[in-house]
Amino acid sequence: MTCDKHTAQTIGKGDLVVVVGAGRSGMAAARLLHRMGARVRLLERNADGVPADFVRWAAEAGVEIATGDHAPTQFEGARAVVPSPGMAVSKLRPLLAQGPDAPEIMAEMELAWRQLDGEPVLAVTGTSGKTTTVSLCAAMLRAQGLSVFLGGNIGTPLSEYVLSVAHGGADGQGRADVLVIEISSFQLQACTTFRPRVAMLLNISENHLDYHADMAEYIDAKFRLFRCMEEGDLAIFGQGVRDLVAARDLKPRTLFFDAAARRFPRTCLLGGHNQANIEAAWQACREFGVTPEAAEKAVADFAPMEHRLEAVAERNGVLWVNDSKCTTVEALRVALQAFDRPVVLMVGGKFKGGDLASLLPLLCGRVRAVVGFGASREHFEGAWMGQGDFPMSWHPALEPAVAEAAALARPGDAVVMAPATSSFDLFANYKERGHAFRRAVEALP
């Protein structure tokens, strides 16, 4: 399989491309494909899932929209298929033709990458810390005076950058000096020629096993980020993946960042893991000419990311912290290590797997109480109930859990919502869960 985007299969005028999913990246891909002259068919299971303004645009542009369950006939004759990040490639393949007539499966990221005109890419992946790290990278680069596009899994699809270049581009100044991209294992599974100049794998822990067949597939997806990199490129890794790196034959220069460097101590970011994110960002940005002075200023001015160990209030001497983005057992471990005060811990949601019992040594002596809400009660109580020196309780909804946490907390404590689960039992996404937590805290008497 070629890594040269110029010799990879091309999409010509009139070629049929099927886009699966009407999320932001799917709609951006459809618009870009239309601009390229392709014949576009967009599939969306939810009949109400396509925004009205996009439906109007599609009607004017001649882009077909089909709702309902996907069928093999919808993919017949397709030159390529662009799946939503949430659709596993393994579930898509049975719907497609095989052999010489098989369409290419490409992520929206891959589609957009092939349309770029030489802009250097700094890409970041990892189980946790991606969004904070790419945001730190963007801040450091901008502090150096560089124009930056920040996007990918963080929110703005790369296709939107490609479409925008003719209309002012990143930072309103045409083409960006650097494209800073957050990329997930979902997106990487369908990337074939994507080549960053600098790429970073922060860490790997058990995650998304409801999507990937097993841990090996998840790890392989993460390492696809480095597949097309060359000797002049730079691959940056956390110390925790050193053995995984040693088992692979990688072409680019490699660097393992020092998570304990504490190079830029002036920051309001909580936790040692954020010091690691800062060091990783610095090592990446040095490649683009960022000076220590510019990086130091960027770190000092950097505000905590929403829903990531975000201090939302301090009431009666109690610090309230929203870590709704904490969706895994490993992320909960990191969250707990960030506090040197007693914690009232709030957990619960749709459990994605992981060894909760392994957290018991960290919970004991550190956690005053555990207050759960929503789904997964059996997982948490099965692992922790009666095993430590902290009481546990459970509530069907978030609001009564916040009220009980307030009653249990003492001055000097932190109430930390670090659910260690996805949000899909009670909320549409982790952001909605975080906002609900903030509202519940603000409503306390």
From Swiss-Prot:
Gene3D superfamilies: Mur ligase, C-terminal domain, Mur-like, catalytic domain, NAD(P)-binding Rossmann-like Domain. GO terms for cellular component: cytoplasm. ATP binds at G126, T127, S128, G129, K130, T131, T132. One of its GO terms (biological process) is regulation of cell shape. It holds the Pfam family Mur_ligase_C. It is found in: Cytoplasm. Its main location: cytoplasm. It comes from the Bacteria. It catalyses: UDP-N-acetyl-alpha-D-muramoyl-L-alanine + D-glutamate + ATP = UDP-N-acetyl-alpha-D-muramoyl-L-alanyl-D-glutamate + ADP + phosphate + H(+). Pathway: Cell wall biogenesis; peptidoglycan biosynthesis. PANTHER family: UDP-N-ACETYLMURAMOYLALANINE--D-GLUTAMATE LIGASE. Belongs to the MurCDEF family. Cell wall formation. Catalyzes the addition of glutamate to the nucleotide precursor UDP-N-acetylmuramoyl-L-alanine (UMA). This is UDP-N-acetylmuramoylalanine--D-glutamate ligase. It comes from Nitratidesulfovibrio vulgaris (strain DSM 19637 / Miyazaki F) (Desulfovibrio vulgaris).
